[in-house]
Amino acid sequence: MSNLRKFKDEERESEYGRVYAVSGPVVTAEAMSGSAMYELVRVGYYELVGEIIRLEGDMATIQVYEETSGVTVGDPVLRTGKPLSVELGPGIMGSIFDGIQRPLRDIGVMTNSIYIPKGVNTTALSRSEMWEFNPLNVRVGSHITGGDLYGVVHENTLVKQRMIVAPRAKGTVRYIAPAGNYNLEDIVLETEFDGEITKHTMLQVWPVRQPRPVTEKLPANHPLFTGQRVLDSLFPCVQGGTTAIPGAFGCGKTVISQALSKYSNSDVIIYVGCGERGNEMSEVLRDFPELTCEIDGVTESIMKRTALVANTSNMPVAAREASIYTGITLSEYFRDMGYNVAMMADSTSRWAEALREISGRLAEMPADSGYPAYLGARLATFYERAGRVKCLGNPEREGSVSIVGAVSPPGGDFSDPVTSATLGIVQVFWGLDKKLAQRKHFPSINWLISYSKYMRALDEYYDKNYPEFVPLRTKVKEILQEEEDLSEIVQLVGKASLAETDKVTLEVAKLLKDDFLQQNSYSPYDRVCPFYKTVGMLRNIMAFYETARHAVESTAQSDNKITWNTIRESMGGIMYQLSSMKFKDPVKDGEQKIKADYDQLYEDLQQAFRNLED
């Protein structure tokens, strides 16, 4: 009996395994019995960060999130006993992390180098920085559970971090810190449950692969305004929605996702650069601090509401996979405070390629185009973490996470496995067109193939705030579709042989394409287009279409019939005004003046047609 192994002897068991084989970012280790799936390990003498992705006997397969050159067989592998997690707390906004939440700015200061050294071990959030903590109405003796708010930290002038009790914690409050300055290691809350005392700091740690719990998911009902006319009017997304932007190289995916992060009506932006060019991330870092948005009459830098997860194409492949999960976990943390968060993933194709590379190293059975068979499932687990929710705990609050994923299919081919898997999951599809981009028509959204499944959900919002908008949108889509059908005839027989009403349709479609759907992201007047301006422009163009068509149809049988040429000659001024509606600057001119100008143009337009018909 005496030589039987007892449980207490297990503690003597070594926490070290040994490296058995190395293949690129995939390391196999032996003597790893007792370790768990997705456990975080430190590989080799440099202590490289890795994660267990397969267990077989006492062998573990580890994907390493750093460069593995120099790791040899027999090197130690240290088990940490916890999953890959991110730190959540004050200090996230305005910072830039890599795929596994290492703070790039701090590492740069610490090492004085432009490269990240191997096995660097820094905390994601600064432990020494002091934050001003203000307790909410939580007193000693009150009962709290996971998700309850117990304090507020003003992280900066744009974002107030509401301190949340960790989702699994509960108990009676024994101590709550008075208002004052604390760092992330100071205890601000103590709870007791079943005689067990738990101490809480302002810092929470959460595993990235696990969604944060919520009370219930709610249907989305408020639009995510992007400031891009073509998207807001024809293919709207909702707060808490999922969107894909597939497009070939040079079509302007990054410009659209940057415009979204600059001008959308979200409270917090998480921008994940996943395997894209390094200079795109540096462009974001250069532009965002200079960009401002106005909140309650005060101009603030946009960087204050943004966190960047940068994982450029020359960083280790495995970390690309983690970067998407890091980004979505940060987003869920702010959602739980009751904010509307927008997460940009640029681009999910690179993430899928990282999956493909790791899967190839593991010798798994490849499916379509060499991607692993679980590609669709992985994409779904990521996109399904979006949504509008009722948050855990008290007071009652609602938050949302909207995901906008850019997809770059090779050669702009939308039948690529990543694109087709993504389109099966997301609700909004903004398809970018190479031909439009070559014609310098930006944003190069192809209005014939794009779609949004949120139209029905948003009808109530539009009816309440912009009652004339829905019929206008339907009419625009009809005109653009009609123009597509007519263009084939025009190529065969020329414009002159068309019916007069068709000529009107063609000209109005041209007006729509050149002066409504096109938008210059680099001009002060047009880089963002508020929704009232979009609706005003639509109303006037459609009024012109209806009246012109009516004038042509009603006089077709009479002697002095009005043709399109007559209209064009007598309406030069009106048509010029219609095409220059976009030059009204929402910042300089203001909402009142723009609306008044558009109403005046509407009156002039009706009057001009009355004069013409008389």
UniProtKB/Swiss-Prot annotation:
GO cellular component: proton-transporting V-type ATPase complex; vacuolar proton-transporting V-type ATPase, V1 domain
Coiled-coil segments: none
GO biological process: ATP metabolic process; cellular response to hypoxia; proton transmembrane transport; vacuolar acidification
Mechanisms controlling activity: ATP hydrolysis occurs at the interface between the nucleotide-binding domains of subunits A and B. ATP hydrolysis triggers a conformational change in the subunits D and F, which induces a shift of subunit d. The c-ring is subsequently rotated and results in a continuous proton translocation across the membrane.
UniProt xrefs under InterPro entries: ATP-synt_VA_C, ATP-synth_a_Xtn, ATP_synth_asu-like_sf, ATPase_a/bsu_AS, ATPase_F1/V1/A1_a/bsu_N, ATPase_F1/V1/A1_a/bsu_N_sf, ATPase_F1/V1/A1_a/bsu_nucl-bd, ATPase_F1/V1_b/a_C
One function term, GO molecular function aspect: ATP binding
EC identifiers of the protein: 7.1.2.2
Entry binding sites for ATP: G247, A248, F249, G250, C251, G252, K253, T254
Keyword terms: ATP-binding, Hydrogen ion transport, Ion transport, Nucleotide-binding, Translocase, Transport
Family matches, as CDD domains: ATP-synt_V_A-type_alpha_C, ATP-synt_V_A-type_alpha_N, V_A-ATPase_A
Chemical reaction(s) catalysed: ATP + H2O + 4 H(+)(in) = ADP + phosphate + 5 H(+)(out)
Subunit organization: V-ATPase is a heteromultimeric enzyme made up of two complexes: the ATP-hydrolytic V1 complex and the proton translocation V0 complex. The V1 complex consists of three catalytic AB heterodimers that form a heterohexamer, three peripheral stalks each consisting of EG heterodimers, one central rotor including subunits D and F, and the regulatory subunits C and H. The proton translocation complex V0 consists of the proton transport subunit a, a ring of proteolipid subunits c9c'', rotary subunit d, subunits e and f, and the accessory subunits VhaAC45 and ATP6AP2.
Family classification: Belongs to the ATPase alpha/beta chains family.
Function description: Catalytic subunit of the V1 complex of vacuolar(H+)-ATPase (V-ATPase), a multisubunit enzyme composed of a peripheral complex (V1) that hydrolyzes ATP and a membrane integral complex (V0) that translocates protons. V-ATPase is responsible for acidifying and maintaining the pH of intracellular compartments and in some cell types, is targeted to the plasma membrane, where it is responsible for acidifying the extracellular environment.
Name of the protein: V-type proton ATPase catalytic subunit A isoform 1
Protein encoded by which gene: Vha68-1
